[in-house]
Amino acid sequence: MLVLFVATWSDLGLCKKRPKPGGWNTGGSRYPGQGSPGGNRYPPQGGGSWGQPHGGGWGQPHGGGWGQPHGGGWGQPHGGGWGQGGGTHNQWNKPSKPKTNMKHVAGAAAAGAVVGGLGGYMLGSAMSRPLIHFGNDYEDRYYRENMYRYPNQVYYRPVDQYSNQNNFVHDCVNITIKQHTVTTTTKGENFTETDVKMMERVVEQMCITQYEKESQAYYQRGSSMVLFSSPPVILLISFLI
Protein backbone atom coordinates (compact mmCIF):
# COMPACT_ATOMS: atom_id res chain seq x y z
CA MET A 1 0.00 0.00 0.00
CA LEU A 2 2.83 2.34 0.81
CA VAL A 3 4.46 1.75 -2.57
CA LEU A 4 1.16 2.38 -4.39
CA PHE A 5 0.65 5.61 -2.47
CA VAL A 6 4.14 6.88 -3.35
CA ALA A 7 3.67 6.09 -7.08
CA THR A 8 0.30 7.89 -7.15
CA TRP A 9 1.76 10.95 -5.43
CA SER A 10 4.65 11.09 -7.95
CA ASP A 11 2.25 11.03 -10.91
CA LEU A 12 0.25 13.91 -9.45
CA GLY A 13 3.44 15.95 -9.04
CA LEU A 14 4.49 15.39 -12.61
CA CYS A 15 1.09 16.44 -13.90
CA LYS A 16 1.36 19.75 -12.06
CA LYS A 17 4.74 20.45 -13.67
CA ARG A 18 3.56 19.82 -17.25
CA PRO A 19 2.69 23.04 -19.15
CA LYS A 20 -0.83 23.50 -20.32
CA PRO A 21 -1.53 23.66 -24.07
CA GLY A 22 -1.24 27.18 -25.43
CA GLY A 23 -4.54 29.02 -25.67
CA TRP A 24 -5.10 32.70 -26.44
CA ASN A 25 -1.90 34.52 -25.54
CA THR A 26 -0.64 31.66 -23.31
CA GLY A 27 2.85 30.26 -23.41
CA GLY A 28 3.51 30.42 -27.16
CA SER A 29 1.54 32.81 -29.30
CA ARG A 30 1.23 31.90 -32.97
CA TYR A 31 1.36 35.56 -34.00
CA PRO A 32 4.17 38.09 -33.64
CA GLY A 33 4.25 41.15 -31.46
CA GLN A 34 1.85 39.91 -28.74
CA GLY A 35 4.35 39.80 -25.90
CA SER A 36 3.48 36.35 -24.60
CA PRO A 37 5.59 35.05 -21.74
CA GLY A 38 6.74 32.07 -23.78
CA GLY A 39 7.82 34.12 -26.79
CA ASN A 40 6.26 34.03 -30.26
CA ARG A 41 7.22 32.03 -33.31
CA TYR A 42 8.61 35.05 -35.26
CA PRO A 43 10.79 36.91 -32.75
CA PRO A 44 12.84 39.96 -33.85
CA GLN A 45 16.30 38.54 -33.20
CA GLY A 46 19.54 40.48 -33.33
CA GLY A 47 18.05 43.95 -33.13
CA GLY A 48 16.16 43.85 -36.44
CA SER A 49 12.58 44.73 -37.15
CA TRP A 50 9.68 42.40 -38.00
CA GLY A 51 10.91 39.38 -39.94
CA GLN A 52 14.58 40.35 -39.61
CA PRO A 53 16.35 37.51 -37.82
CA HIS A 54 19.81 39.06 -38.29
CA GLY A 55 19.29 42.77 -38.37
CA GLY A 56 18.37 43.39 -42.00
CA GLY A 57 15.33 45.00 -43.58
CA TRP A 58 11.98 43.33 -44.27
CA GLY A 59 12.62 39.82 -45.54
CA GLN A 60 16.38 40.22 -45.10
CA PRO A 61 17.63 37.25 -43.06
CA HIS A 62 21.28 38.34 -43.28
CA GLY A 63 21.28 42.09 -43.47
CA GLY A 64 20.80 42.75 -47.18
CA GLY A 65 18.18 44.77 -49.04
CA TRP A 66 14.66 43.59 -49.86
CA GLY A 67 14.86 40.00 -51.05
CA GLN A 68 18.61 39.87 -50.42
CA PRO A 69 19.36 36.82 -48.25
CA HIS A 70 23.10 37.52 -48.12
CA GLY A 71 23.55 41.25 -48.42
CA GLY A 72 23.53 41.87 -52.17
CA GLY A 73 21.32 44.12 -54.27
CA TRP A 74 17.76 43.31 -55.33
CA GLY A 75 17.64 39.70 -56.43
CA GLN A 76 21.29 39.17 -55.47
CA PRO A 77 21.46 36.15 -53.14
CA HIS A 78 25.24 36.39 -52.61
CA GLY A 79 26.17 40.02 -53.03
CA GLY A 80 26.51 40.33 -56.80
CA GLY A 81 24.91 42.78 -59.21
CA TRP A 82 21.33 42.58 -60.45
CA GLY A 83 20.69 39.03 -61.59
CA GLN A 84 24.17 37.88 -60.49
CA GLY A 85 23.96 35.01 -58.04
CA GLY A 86 27.61 35.13 -57.01
CA GLY A 87 28.94 38.38 -58.39
CA THR A 88 30.40 36.94 -61.61
CA HIS A 89 28.12 33.99 -62.28
CA ASN A 90 24.73 33.81 -63.97
CA GLN A 91 25.22 37.04 -65.90
CA TRP A 92 22.43 36.16 -68.28
CA ASN A 93 21.56 39.76 -68.95
CA LYS A 94 25.05 40.81 -70.06
CA PRO A 95 25.12 41.82 -73.75
CA SER A 96 27.50 39.93 -75.97
CA LYS A 97 30.42 41.79 -77.55
CA PRO A 98 29.61 42.79 -81.16
CA LYS A 99 31.58 41.00 -83.83
CA THR A 100 33.33 42.80 -86.64
CA ASN A 101 31.39 42.55 -89.86
CA MET A 102 33.90 42.01 -92.67
CA LYS A 103 31.35 43.16 -95.23
CA HIS A 104 31.40 46.63 -93.67
CA VAL A 105 35.19 46.63 -93.67
CA ALA A 106 35.29 45.69 -97.34
CA GLY A 107 32.68 48.35 -98.10
CA ALA A 108 35.14 51.06 -97.09
CA ALA A 109 36.89 50.56 -100.42
CA ALA A 110 33.66 50.81 -102.40
CA ALA A 111 32.91 53.42 -105.03
CA GLY A 112 33.41 56.99 -103.89
CA ALA A 113 35.33 56.08 -100.74
CA VAL A 114 38.15 58.48 -99.84
CA VAL A 115 41.50 56.70 -100.13
CA GLY A 116 43.77 57.24 -97.15
CA GLY A 117 47.20 58.71 -97.88
CA LEU A 118 46.25 60.11 -101.31
CA GLY A 119 45.30 63.63 -100.31
CA GLY A 120 41.53 63.45 -100.75
CA TYR A 121 41.38 61.27 -103.85
CA MET A 122 38.46 58.89 -104.17
CA LEU A 123 38.31 55.50 -105.83
CA GLY A 124 35.66 55.13 -108.52
CA SER A 125 33.49 52.15 -109.33
CA ALA A 126 34.90 49.24 -111.27
CA MET A 127 34.36 49.59 -115.01
CA SER A 128 34.57 47.35 -118.02
CA ARG A 129 37.76 48.08 -119.91
CA PRO A 130 36.88 49.84 -123.18
CA LEU A 131 37.53 48.27 -126.56
CA ILE A 132 40.11 50.52 -128.20
CA HIS A 133 41.74 50.31 -131.62
CA PHE A 134 45.34 51.52 -131.72
CA GLY A 135 45.75 51.69 -135.49
CA ASN A 136 47.69 48.48 -136.16
CA ASP A 137 47.04 44.80 -135.72
CA TYR A 138 49.98 44.21 -133.39
CA GLU A 139 48.88 46.76 -130.78
CA ASP A 140 45.24 45.73 -131.07
CA ARG A 141 46.17 42.13 -130.43
CA TYR A 142 48.57 43.06 -127.64
CA TYR A 143 45.85 45.06 -125.93
CA ARG A 144 43.30 42.27 -126.12
CA GLU A 145 45.82 39.84 -124.62
CA ASN A 146 46.99 42.15 -121.80
CA MET A 147 44.01 44.35 -120.98
CA TYR A 148 43.39 42.45 -117.73
CA ARG A 149 46.71 43.88 -116.43
CA TYR A 150 45.46 47.45 -116.72
CA PRO A 151 43.33 49.37 -114.20
CA ASN A 152 39.55 48.99 -114.13
CA GLN A 153 39.06 51.75 -111.51
CA VAL A 154 40.28 55.34 -111.45
CA TYR A 155 41.31 57.77 -108.72
CA TYR A 156 39.79 61.25 -108.81
CA ARG A 157 38.88 64.29 -106.77
CA PRO A 158 35.45 65.95 -106.64
CA VAL A 159 34.58 67.76 -109.87
CA ASP A 160 33.95 71.06 -108.10
CA GLN A 161 37.71 71.29 -107.46
CA TYR A 162 38.43 71.62 -111.21
CA SER A 163 37.64 74.41 -113.63
CA ASN A 164 37.01 72.11 -116.60
CA GLN A 165 36.93 68.51 -117.80
CA ASN A 166 40.47 68.52 -119.21
CA ASN A 167 42.02 69.32 -115.83
CA PHE A 168 39.95 66.63 -114.15
CA VAL A 169 40.90 63.99 -116.73
CA HIS A 170 44.60 64.93 -116.74
CA ASP A 171 44.86 64.64 -112.96
CA CYS A 172 42.78 61.46 -112.94
CA VAL A 173 45.01 59.74 -115.53
CA ASN A 174 48.26 60.67 -113.79
CA ILE A 175 47.30 59.53 -110.29
CA THR A 176 45.62 56.34 -111.51
CA ILE A 177 48.56 55.17 -113.64
CA LYS A 178 51.03 56.10 -110.90
CA GLN A 179 49.17 54.14 -108.23
CA HIS A 180 48.59 51.13 -110.48
CA THR A 181 52.21 51.05 -111.61
CA VAL A 182 53.61 51.27 -108.09
CA THR A 183 51.24 48.62 -106.78
CA THR A 184 51.92 46.23 -109.64
CA THR A 185 55.68 46.76 -109.55
CA THR A 186 55.82 45.77 -105.89
CA LYS A 187 54.31 42.44 -106.94
CA GLY A 188 57.24 41.83 -109.29
CA GLU A 189 55.52 42.77 -112.56
CA ASN A 190 56.97 45.43 -114.85
CA PHE A 191 55.38 47.44 -117.66
CA THR A 192 56.87 48.10 -121.06
CA GLU A 193 56.51 51.32 -123.06
CA THR A 194 53.70 49.66 -124.99
CA ASP A 195 51.90 48.90 -121.73
CA VAL A 196 52.20 52.50 -120.56
CA LYS A 197 50.92 53.80 -123.90
CA MET A 198 47.89 51.52 -123.78
CA MET A 199 47.21 52.26 -120.13
CA GLU A 200 47.12 55.98 -120.88
CA ARG A 201 44.46 55.46 -123.56
CA VAL A 202 42.41 53.09 -121.43
CA VAL A 203 42.55 55.19 -118.26
CA GLU A 204 41.77 58.37 -120.21
CA GLN A 205 38.51 56.88 -121.47
CA MET A 206 37.63 55.71 -117.97
CA CYS A 207 38.40 59.13 -116.46
CA ILE A 208 36.14 60.81 -119.03
CA THR A 209 33.35 58.42 -118.08
CA GLN A 210 33.96 59.13 -114.38
CA TYR A 211 33.86 62.88 -114.99
CA GLU A 212 30.52 62.67 -116.80
CA LYS A 213 29.07 60.57 -114.01
CA GLU A 214 30.31 62.87 -111.24
CA SER A 215 29.23 66.03 -113.09
CA GLN A 216 25.71 64.73 -113.52
CA ALA A 217 25.45 63.85 -109.84
CA TYR A 218 26.89 67.23 -108.84
CA TYR A 219 24.39 69.21 -110.91
CA GLN A 220 21.52 67.10 -109.63
CA ARG A 221 22.50 67.92 -106.06
CA GLY A 222 22.77 71.60 -106.97
CA SER A 223 19.33 71.58 -108.61
CA SER A 224 17.81 70.01 -105.51
CA MET A 225 19.34 72.71 -103.30
CA VAL A 226 18.01 75.47 -105.56
CA LEU A 227 14.56 73.90 -105.61
CA PHE A 228 14.27 73.62 -101.84
CA SER A 229 15.70 77.10 -101.28
CA SER A 230 13.15 78.87 -103.52
CA PRO A 231 10.65 81.11 -101.65
CA PRO A 232 7.47 79.25 -102.79
CA VAL A 233 8.86 75.92 -101.60
CA ILE A 234 9.98 77.41 -98.29
CA LEU A 235 6.52 78.93 -97.80
CA LEU A 236 4.85 75.60 -98.59
CA ILE A 237 7.09 73.70 -96.20
CA SER A 238 6.48 76.21 -93.41
CA PHE A 239 2.73 75.95 -94.00
CA LEU A 240 2.84 72.15 -93.80
CA ILE A 241 4.88 72.25 -90.62
Swiss-Prot record:
Residues 1-15 form the signal peptide. One of its GO terms (cellular component) is side of membrane. Disulfide bonds join C172-C207. The keyword Transmembrane does not apply. GO terms for molecular function: copper ion binding. Glycans are attached at N174, N190. It is found in: Cell membrane; Golgi apparatus. Residues 224-241 form a propeptide. The lineage of its organism: Eukaryota, Metazoa, Chordata, Craniata, Vertebrata. GO terms for biological process: protein homooligomerization. This is Major prion protein. Its primary physiological function is unclear. May play a role in neuronal development and synaptic plasticity. May be required for neuronal myelin sheath maintenance. May promote myelin homeostasis through acting as an agonist for ADGRG6 receptor. May play a role in iron uptake and iron homeostasis. Soluble oligomers are toxic to cultured neuroblastoma cells and induce apoptosis (in vitro). Association with GPC1 (via its heparan sulfate chains) targets PRNP to lipid rafts. Also provides Cu(2+) or Zn(2+) for the ascorbate-mediated GPC1 deaminase degradation of its heparan sulfate side chains. Gene3D superfamilies: Prion/Doppel protein, beta-ribbon domain (1.10.790.10). The keyword Glycoprotein applies. It comes from Plecturocebus moloch. Residues 45-88 have a biased composition (Gly residues). The normal, monomeric form has a mainly alpha-helical structure. The disease-associated, protease-resistant form forms amyloid fibrils containing a cross-beta spine, formed by a steric zipper of superposed beta-strands. Disease mutations may favor intermolecular contacts via short beta strands, and may thereby trigger oligomerization. Contains an N-terminal region composed of octamer repeats. At low copper concentrations, the sidechains of His residues from three or four repeats contribute to the binding of a single copper ion. Alternatively, a copper ion can be bound by interaction with the sidechain and backbone amide nitrogen of a single His residue. The observed copper binding stoichiometry suggests that two repeat regions cooperate to stabilize the binding of a single copper ion. At higher copper concentrations, each octamer can bind one copper ion by interactions with the His sidechain and Gly backbone atoms. Residues 16-223 are annotated as: Interaction with GRB2, ERI3 and SYN1. Cu(2+) 1 binds at H54, G55, G56.
